[in-house]
Swiss-Prot record:
GO biological process, one term: glucose metabolic process
Function per UniProt: Specific and highly efficient GDP-D-glucose phosphorylase regulating the levels of GDP-D-glucose in cells.
Matching PANTHER family: GDP-D-GLUCOSE PHOSPHORYLASE 1 (PTHR20884:SF8)
GO-annotated molecular function: GDP-D-glucose phosphorylase activity; guanyl-nucleotide exchange factor activity; hydrolase activity; nucleotide binding
Catalytic reaction annotation: GDP-alpha-D-glucose + phosphate = alpha-D-glucose 1-phosphate + GDP + H(+)
Active site residues according to the UniProt entry: H255
GO cellular component: cytoplasm
Protein name listed in UniProt: GDP-D-glucose phosphorylase 1
InterPro entries: GDPGP
Tissue specificity of this protein: Expressed throughout the neuronal system, in the spermatheca and anterior hypodermal cells.
Keyword line: Cytoplasm, Guanine-nucleotide releasing factor, Hydrolase, Nucleotide-binding, Nucleotidyltransferase, Transferase
Source organism: Caenorhabditis elegans
Amino acid sequence: MEPFPRILDDRLPRNMRRPRPIDKMPMRKIVMLGANARTQRSVSSIQLPAEYSPSASSAPYFNYSPDDFILDLRSHQSDEIYENGNSNHEKDEKKALKELLHERWENAKQYNAFNYPLNCMYRCLDGKYDLSMQLNIERGELRRKPMHFKNIKEPFNHLRFNFAKLHDHEILFYLKCDTDPISNDLLDRHLVAVNASPLERDHSLIVPSVNKCSPQVLTLQAVRIAVDLMLLVDDDMFHILFNSLLGQASVNHLHLHAMYWPYDSDLINRKCEPLHDVPNVYVIRPPVWICPAIVFQLDSLDNYEQFKMNIYKCVEHLTESNQAHNLFLARAQPIRTTGAEKEEDRRGERPQLVTCYVFPRMNMIGAKPPSNFNPAANELAGNLTSYTIRFFESANEQSVIRIIEEEASLDDDTFRSLCFDLADVLIGRSVGTSRPQDLDTLAGLTSPEIDELRDSFQSFMPRSPSIRHRSSTRAQSDEGSK
């Protein structure tokens, strides 16, 4: 039987037609970007990270605008009480952020997003600084093993853990500012995710531009997100923290911590001093507080841009100087430069303004070992976490300060020199212009070299507060015996 004439082939049903040459060709396998670390190059001019999938997450967006910002938490609470008592005022978008964070964080529990259930104990330490301490044994035992770092500006390494590898149920929501975009890049995704080893309820991670896979170096964009969230959450227990590499950071992928702490840090009640000739920038140092810090406060939304830029310039200088640092953002009363060292607002009458404390600190080379507690941003603000029941029960203010002095606090001369340099940076002068001559002689020396230089001229005196106290007591008794 002769085959069908070719002219009739197109008239047959599709399933009876003879295969054409193109149909015989094998289908080329399509490799999804992110399915394999050795993924094929995309035809797009923009190459996303291998692990990143922008459409995979079902997490919602939180949209906000500067109109939602709360400058003074105290006056906002008064206005809210009035509105609730006189009208059916709709809940603000800014209040929805707090509710969304809590709702999504609680919802993540059903997916086993956390390494352990929260079951923490607290105690307040007697002493000058009103330190509070949490017992969190599970965090010390079950958290991800900290990574080893040698430099503050280590490049991002996609082979190590990073937040592009988060599961969908770990992403709480994305951030988007409607009127003033956080980034000009439409592919940027700024997310808030669970912290799998939390300190407190709603403890989360803020990851700016997760698709960019930036190292743990604070950017102006990250500062902006931190300030915005502080202005959006109407709760004085809410804080945002940042730890640099060599300053207790565990992951080299740009992130900040968002969390609540059930006790006020006494840091917000302390007197400061001006940072030389720089307006609206302050310094706090021992003995007013347990460790030195640079302080910034947003007292008007007109100063919003300058506030962000000052924080960024400060951190940028520390990063370029390879100086480890921690940031602690809180709601604090207006900064005082006169009066008593400590003044509490017991009546709740003073404004509560967004305040940023930048703690320059000693560099800690290598992975942080498991110990009684690790002095990071929250600890330097007086909010301590103990990983052992023994230390939790036996710790006192002096033992805590001793650990902070030995592992974090800069010595007086180093901090003084840093303050002069920061004043030059913030004013726009050449760095070193305002530094006194006596500090110039120590420039370029490492901390051990400076200590050796001091030891050659004076007897060694341990920095322990308890030993210092015993020494002064012994000296007084010697004078009395004479």
